[in-house]
């Protein structure tokens, strides 16, 4: 089969709150998704009991349906209609912009749909049938979100995906490029848990103000070291010489009191050079354009979520039988989800994982082992080693049977400038872009369902090409 046009590839990533959509890939580099829409649709009931679906509630009589909750599809009919809404909207938009679009990018659209681990086999087959028979799309791949995350890292063989959602967090182990379905685990805590904690600290604030604080650049998670160093005073350090130069002429011509100008300038310089963690108070803007002042609460609210995630990760990964695979998984932790864009969140979660699960040789055992190793060395070697430290290569190390002895975050790719600029909280979508380009622009059709395969086997064709 001939490769598809890159500007014809459609990627849809449905989630509980919002859905990310991109139609057409950039020829030169991958970019962040162009559309983020609420995962919802309106439904009205006819007299015969059947339903009709709408994008808006024009007459205020329609029922609002959110077909996905905690990643799981709870209304498959509403979900398929939601997919239709997206597809028809794209067709309409492109056709209005270009009358010849149906002979170009709209002539043959391949769809990559990112799926959640909780979707049942029945859900996946119903979606497949709807895509081919109702939407009349001729080529489809359903890609699990966990595998999309691994491909964003250029195909990690062993890793652990921690996907922090709004109301839940998924922990998904990947071993030998395969999702371990029997070990996939979820906890009923996510970004909303942070809001709930902040609400207790700031009971006078409404929900919108708390959400605005959480999304503001001044909201961050401080490491233990940063908390110790944070003094909350207005020290003014490392000022540039240019910033210390007075413009006397400007002060004179301004007509203002000299002392007032100097005091204002000094305050500005101090605030400019002080870290957020050193300020007793800082301000942010809410969605209504109001400037709001907040204290230490901007560093709080995440601890409980982080501790619970760390605990569940440990319980999950302890069930991996192969010790070598388990070690490799611990060395490639991938943290994704909108909540992880909070400054310091990933680092704090890594710190908690190290604190809770890292296996370190006790100091007494280490000292005893080093002394025993030195005692069996030849005399000549001892003379040579008297100027060496205890960490010389002569002292053997112990390979512990338990794991983890190393816990690390997987290295994010740095050769996608647009993604690097915006952050990697939605890196699952980047993985989908990589996969779609590799598969849909390749002449072989091994990894996706074609119209020919569907006509032969129907929705069951999905299981012959599952990625």
From Swiss-Prot:
Gene Ontology molecular function, alphabetical: structural molecule activity
Pfam family, one: Actin
Source species, domain of life: Eukaryota
CDD domains xrefs: ASKHA_NBD_ScArp9-like
GO biological process: chromatin organization; chromatin remodeling; nucleosome disassembly; positive regulation of transcription by RNA polymerase II; regulation of DNA-templated transcription; regulation of transcription by RNA polymerase II; transcription elongation by RNA polymerase II
SMART domains referenced in this protein's UniProt entry, alphabetically: ACTIN
One term under GO cellular component: RSC-type complex
SUPFAM superfamilies the record matches: Actin-like ATPase domain
Principal location class: nucleus
InterPro entries attached to this UniProt entry: Actin, ATPase_NBD
Subcellular compartments: Nucleus
UniProt entry keywords in alphabetical sequence: Chromatin regulator, Nucleus, Transcription, Transcription regulation
Keyword check for Membrane: no
Coiled-coil ranges per UniProt: none
Physiological role: Component of the chromatin structure remodeling complex (RSC), which is involved in transcription regulation and nucleosome positioning. RSC is responsible for the transfer of a histone octamer from a nucleosome core particle to naked DNA. The reaction requires ATP and involves an activated RSC-nucleosome intermediate. Remodeling reaction also involves DNA translocation, DNA twist and conformational change.
Family to which this protein belongs: Belongs to the actin family.
Record text on subunit structure and interactions: Forms a heterodimer with ARP7. Interacts with LDB7 and NPL6. Component of the two forms of the RSC complex composed of at least either RSC1 or RSC2, and ARP7, ARP9, LDB7, NPL6, RSC3, RSC30, RSC4, RSC58, RSC6, RSC8, RSC9, SFH1, STH1, HTL1 and probably RTT102. The complexes interact with histone and histone variant components of centromeric chromatin. Component of the SWI/SNF global transcription activator complex.
Other information: Present with 1790 molecules/cell in log phase SD medium.
UniProt name for this protein: Actin-like protein ARP9
């Amino acid at each position: 089969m001939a490769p598809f046009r890159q500007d014809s590839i459609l990627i849809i990533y449905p989630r509980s709150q919002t859905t990310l959509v991109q139609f057409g890939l950039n020829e030169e580099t991958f970019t962040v998704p162009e559309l983020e829409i609420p995962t919802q649709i309106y439904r009205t009931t006819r007299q015969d009991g059947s339903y009709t679906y709408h994008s808006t509630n024009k007459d205020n009589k329609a029922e609002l349906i959110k077909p996905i909750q905690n990643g799981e599809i709870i209304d498959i009919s509403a979900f398929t209609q939601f997919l239709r809404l997206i597809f028809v909207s794209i067709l309409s938009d492109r056709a209005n912009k270009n009358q010849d679009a149906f002979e170009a990018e709209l002539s043959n659209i391949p769809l990559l749909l990112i799926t959640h681990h909780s979707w049942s086999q029945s859900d996946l087959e119903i979606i497949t049938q709807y895509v081919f028979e109702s939407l009349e799309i001729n080529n489809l791949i359903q890609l699990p979100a966990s595998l999309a995350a691994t491909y964003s890292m250029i195909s990690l063989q062993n890793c652990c995906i921690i996907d922090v959602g709004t109301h839940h967090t998924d922990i998904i182990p990947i071993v030998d490029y395969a999702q371990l379905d029997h070990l996939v685990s979820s906890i009923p805590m996510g970004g909303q848990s942070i809001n709930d904690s902040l609400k207790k600290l700031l009971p006078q604030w409404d929900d919108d103000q708390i959400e605005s604080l959480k999304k503001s650049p001044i909201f961050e998670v401080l490491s233990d070291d940063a908390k110790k160093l944070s003094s909350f005073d207005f020290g003014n350090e490392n000022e540039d010489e240019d910033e210390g130069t007075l413009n006397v002429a400007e002060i004179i011509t301004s007509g203002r009191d000299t002392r007032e100008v100097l005091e204002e300038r000094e305050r500005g310089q101090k605030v400019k050079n002080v870290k957020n963690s050193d300020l007793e108070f800082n301000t942010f803007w809410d969605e209504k354009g109001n400037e709001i002042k907040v204290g230490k609460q901007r560093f709080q609210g995440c601890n409980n979520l982080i501790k619970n995630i760390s605990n569940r990760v440990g319980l999950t990964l302890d069930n991996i039988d192969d010790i070598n695979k388990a070690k490799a998984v611990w060395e490639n932790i991938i943290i994704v989800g909108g909540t992880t864009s909070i400054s310091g969140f990933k680092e704090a979660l890594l710190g908690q994982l190290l604190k809770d699960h890292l296996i370190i040789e006790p100091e007494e055992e280490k000292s005893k082992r080093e002394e025993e190793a030195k005692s069996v060395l030849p005399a000549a070697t001892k003379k040579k080693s008297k100027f060496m430290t205890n960490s010389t290569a002569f002292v053997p190390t112990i390979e512990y049977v338990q794991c983890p002895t190393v816990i690390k975050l997987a290295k994010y790719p740095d050769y996608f400038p647009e993604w690097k600029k915006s952050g990697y909280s939605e890196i699952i979508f980047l993985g989908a872009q990589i996969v779609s380009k590799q598969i849909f622009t390749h002449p072989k059709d091994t990894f996706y369902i074609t119209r020919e395969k569907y006509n032969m086997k129907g929705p069951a064709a999905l299981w012959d090409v599952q990625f």
